[in-house]
Amino acid sequence: MHKQAKRYFLLGAVTFALAACGQGVDADQQGTGEGTIELAEFPDRPYWGDTHLHTDNSIDAFGFGVRLGPEEALMFASGQEVTATTGMRAKLARPLDFLVISDHSDGLGATRRLYDAPRLGVVAMGDETMLRWYDMMHESPEQSQRAIGELITAAANGTLPEAMTNNPEEQDAATAEIWGAHLEMLDRYNKPGKFTAFAGFEYTLMPDGNNLHRVVMFRDGLDRTGQVLPYPGINSDIEGLWDYMLAYEQATGGQALAIPHNSNLSNGLMFELTMPGGGPITAEYARKRAAAEPVVEVTQIKGDSEAHPFLSPNDEMAGFGVKGWELGNLPLTRETTNDMLAGNYIREALKRGLSLEEQLGVNPYAFGMIGSTDSHTSLATGDEDNFYGKHTGNEPSYQDRALEGQNLGTRIGRFGWHYLAGGYAAAWARGNTRAEIFDAFQRREVYATTGPRMTVRLFGGFDFSEADWDGDWVRAGYTRGVPMGGELEDRGNAPTFLISALKDPDGANLDRVQVVKGWVDSSGELQERLYDVSWSDMDKRSRVGGKVPAVGDTVDRATATYTNDIGAAELRTAWTDPDYVEGQRAFYYVRVIEIPTPRWTLFDAVRFGIELPEDAMADAVAQERAYSSPIWLKPAPPAIMEQQ
């Protein structure tokens, strides 16, 4: 085990002791009430949540101005009204079912401590950079944001002031106090059957500014999570995080998983074909990654990582959420070039995983897909008409937030309108409890949306047909096939998929349902194909040149409104792969596309009377979407194929 991983496990005894001194529940009551919740026979509905939310405990969020903490975050997500940092009253139209507060493990609560410190104490530390940041944080919101931008760049470049890194024992004690109080609060707000509050943190690994961040999510309550401290990203590596998670599980009997995010800002490093330090990926490394990271965050405020037009030129809808974010890494200190894109985007990673599995016998990139917000306002909302911004500096009270530059570094290129109002995670579970939702993540029976709450279901098998819709097709899906996230063993005939999509009951109609297939061909080359398998008005929208025509557009740009006069409320099909080849390794996932609707930028333009630039106005209407987790088709062992 990495020494650092061991250190952060052993220090958890301090956390647990501090938390136990507070108002927390007894250790032996972890998960109280979960055993009394009546569970469905099969997962019967998607539970909606956000696994990536920051509060004033995050070093950047506080510096960017947020003054709401974990309690306000839990209140807001569970449907209560709160007052945003800028003074506006904020409430979700529909509460979430679960939440992971994922404050950065590095410097947990540090900017608040620096801000609250007496200036003479900072002067006494003898570091000019820290004193300058302190003064900037107190000068104005704009200067505070600039200070945090410098701090993040310094962390990425390994140039943080020594005063911030040379006293780990003091930092650990401060972290333990904050972490313990946070865990106690989560257990108080966790209401099995009504609202699930998960412990978690963000591991912020960022070599040279390239985003390799993960959210760590725990299945457990205070009695187990209180035995660890959040694992830091500074001066560590990804295998150290996995060792930390394994040590936690072995010592406590608990469970943890890691969720990579913003691969689009990794400059090709997130889904490499080599080890992080160079050389070919080993089977051991692939096994560790597959075990630790069953899902990936595909969409969020800082862009969408599903696909890129350069990698998928035949997919006319591959450019969603790409603008601005494809320019470079997170702080824009390094440009992104075309040769890096394959390591940035999830469709390509899924394809690479097939190739690696053929070589190694294990697939390190066999992950499900979720969305989340990465909001730094303590407000988990992925709704276009209720978008509270990435951070406090672009909450709705700032009328020009769509036009302002959003650059942590010095290069110009990203603007407020590049932010997406999304996304959410949907978990198919038998009930709203920590155990049920976490287990759905673990088995990859989850899907992502860019904000709307569409209901998407996917089953794969070998004997499904349209006739199954007339019976209990959900039972058929589970008993005769596998759900999204599952694996099928090749039987020598083409797989068939039961695909069902229902519109968000409070949202837009559906344009189409697509299947994305990736495979390794007989020459060992990676291939992909996109199939339109069901769409609205199929009798009127016949294919032209092999393509389904556009659904139309009802958005009124002058009022930021649309109508559901086009599209369909429900789309479903039993689809059989027409290009199946026996023994071919493949994956299939579903992409559900809505009709065009206004983005938050258009709502702002109408609300505040703003004239958007031409490029922003062209992007002010979008087709929101959902991405299912894949189903993998694996070659049967030779002995089985010979018997068939």
Model-derived features: positions:
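Gram-negative bacterial Sec-dependent N-terminal signal peptides
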Residues: 2-23
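C-terminal functional module detector
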Residues: 22-70, 74, 81-131, 168-171, ...
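Aromatic- and acidic-residue-enriched carbohydrate-binding clefts of CAZyme catalytic domains
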Residues: 123-165
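Long, charge-dense tracts
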Residues: 217-219
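Conserved, charged catalytic cores of large soluble enzymes
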Residues: 222, 232-236
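Acidic, metal/ion-coordinating pockets
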Residues: 240
